[in-house]
């Protein structure tokens, strides 16, 4: 007895191919945070829907932003920053 799928997943699309004006730059940490988990890992392209070309660029820019201290390497740092600012 075969099981039928209850739903059909919607087709994923690359945000950067759809919107040519959306910059993919290490200085735009707000955009890059959408492609990182709360633990600091880069999300795979099969989940985000980005094309292979833009996933390579995205990975490079995330790594640059980490080196420039615009993004954190691991989780837990944002709470540390809040504690230091409260002192």
Swiss-Prot record:
Gene3D superfamilies: Ribosomal protein S18. One of its GO terms (molecular function) is small ribosomal subunit rRNA binding. InterPro entries: Ribosomal_bS18 (IPR001648), Ribosomal_bS18_sf (IPR036870). One of its GO terms (cellular component) is cytosolic small ribosomal subunit. Keywords: Ribonucleoprotein, Ribosomal protein, RNA-binding, rRNA-binding. Binds as a heterodimer with protein bS6 to the central domain of the 16S rRNA, where it helps stabilize the platform of the 30S subunit. Part of the 30S ribosomal subunit. Forms a tight heterodimer with protein bS6. This is Small ribosomal subunit protein bS18. The gene is rpsR.
């Amino acid at each position: 007895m075969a099981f039928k799928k209850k739903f059909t997943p919607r087709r994923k699309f690359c945000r950067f191919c759809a919107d040519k004006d959306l910059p993919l730059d290490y200085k735009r940490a707000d955009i890059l945070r959408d492609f990182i988990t709360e633990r600091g890992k880069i999300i795979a392209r099969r989940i985000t829907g980005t094309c292979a070309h833009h996933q390579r660029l995205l990975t490079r820019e995330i790594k640059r932003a980490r080196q420039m201290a615009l993004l954190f390497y691991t989780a837990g740092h944002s709470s540390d920053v809040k504690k230091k600012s409260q002192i």
